[in-house]
């Protein structure tokens, strides 16, 4: 779908009775009916928010699981933070992302083919990584650049890749001190002037799952009582968003939150399904599966996510 106004497009997966054939999406091919008429499913919409520099098609496996249970799935391309247009280094995208989810719901509601088949008063949201940050925002979380600065001052070494990205790694060598100095200097230069806090909720959103969310910039008190049911997926070997500072910190602050699934052997890229091929360098170290992790576990995780939405969106058993 075209994005509302001049916004980025929204990729939509939906139930259809048409014949399936190979459809190329980015680096992989899915079996789908690319132009088939949508049919009525369970009447509910789930919005998937991709990670930084990502794309909707890396969540195709989850989308297909949801569609098989009757959901329509909308996946906005987050402006300035997707594979075709990636401008890292600022919080511009994070300030827009939750609103882009709301606009994706608007786009579906304005589509003459889809709108009559859906009730948009109870929408689900799933987000991974920066998409998990988006999900936490929609759950009522308040965040600020200054909390990011404070976190990285206190935990720069332990949470290096969250604070600096995947440009370089700490190696234990003599250059590490210089890398830390440069990182601190850049963090303060870019963010010291932004003293605001940010948030955005949408009354149509009724259930949220955040997988490996970036959570350190949040005031955890704002997530102690989410505005809607909130579930988390945790990845035990995540080196990009170290769980103790992110997903586990949310679970510790939020007694009502549910751990939808835990993958103790999984790295950060586990929830990219399919995983992009040919990842190397520091990015490959962050996203490629660590030894001992089996992707055979992922279909069950997808089913648990779908079950969480079904419980909280009022959907009966398929």
Predicted regions and their residues:
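Active-site-adjacent alpha-helix of alpha/beta-hydrolase-fold enzymes
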Residues: 225-296
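Catalytic nucleophile serine of serine hydrolases
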Residues: 51, 129, 212
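Short substrate-entry loop that stabilizes the transition state in hydrolases
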Residues: 20, 34-43, 48-86, 239-243
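Alpha/beta-hydrolase active-site loop
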Residues: 90-116, 137, 142, 146-181, ...
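Hydrolases whose catalytic domains are alpha/beta-hydrolase-1, hotdog thioesterase
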Residues: 134-138, 219
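Domain-level recognition of soluble alpha/beta enzyme cores
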Residues: 1-46
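The feature captures the conserved acid-bearing segment of alpha/beta-hydrolase catalytic domains
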Residues: 172-257
């Amino acid at each position: 779908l075209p994005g509302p106004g001049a916004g980025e497009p929204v990729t939509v997966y939906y139930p259809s009775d048409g014949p399936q054939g190979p459809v190329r999406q980015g680096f992989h091919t899915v079996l789908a009916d690319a132009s088939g008429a949508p049919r009525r499913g369970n009447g509910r919409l789930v919005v998937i928010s991709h990670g930084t520099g990502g794309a909707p098609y890396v969540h195709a496996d989850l989308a297909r699981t949801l569609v098989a249970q009757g959901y329509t799935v909308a996946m906005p391309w987050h402006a300035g933070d997707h594979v075709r247009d990636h401008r890292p280094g600022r919080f511009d995208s994070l300030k827009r992302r939750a609103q882009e989810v709301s606009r994706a719901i608007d786009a579906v509601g304005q589509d003459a083919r889809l709108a009559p088949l859906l009730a948009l008063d109870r929408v689900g949201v799933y987000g991974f990584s920066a998409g998990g940050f988006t999900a936490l925002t929609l759950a009522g979380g308040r965040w600020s650049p200054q909390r990011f600065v404070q976190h990285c001052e206190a935990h720069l070494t332990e949470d290096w890749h969250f604070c600096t990205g995947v440009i370089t790694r700490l190696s234990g060598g003599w250059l590490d001190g210089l890398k830390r100095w440069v990182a601190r200097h850049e963090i303060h230069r870019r963010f010291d002037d932004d003293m605001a806090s940010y948030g955005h909720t949408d009354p149509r959103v009724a259930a949220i799952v955040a997988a490996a969310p970036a959570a350190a910039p949040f005031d955890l008190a704002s997530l102690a009582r989410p505005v809607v049911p909130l579930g988390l997926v945790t990845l035990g070997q995540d080196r990009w968003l170290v769980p103790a500072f992110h997903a586990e910190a949310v679970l510790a602050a939020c007694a009502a939150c549910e751990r939808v699934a835990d993958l103790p052997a999984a790295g950060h890229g586990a929830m990219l399904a399919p995983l992009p091929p040919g990842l190397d360098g520091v990015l490959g170290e962050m996203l490629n599966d660590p030894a001992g992790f089996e992707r055979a576990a992922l279909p069950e995780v997808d089913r648990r996510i779908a079950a969480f939405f079904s419980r909280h969106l009022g959907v009966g058993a398929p």
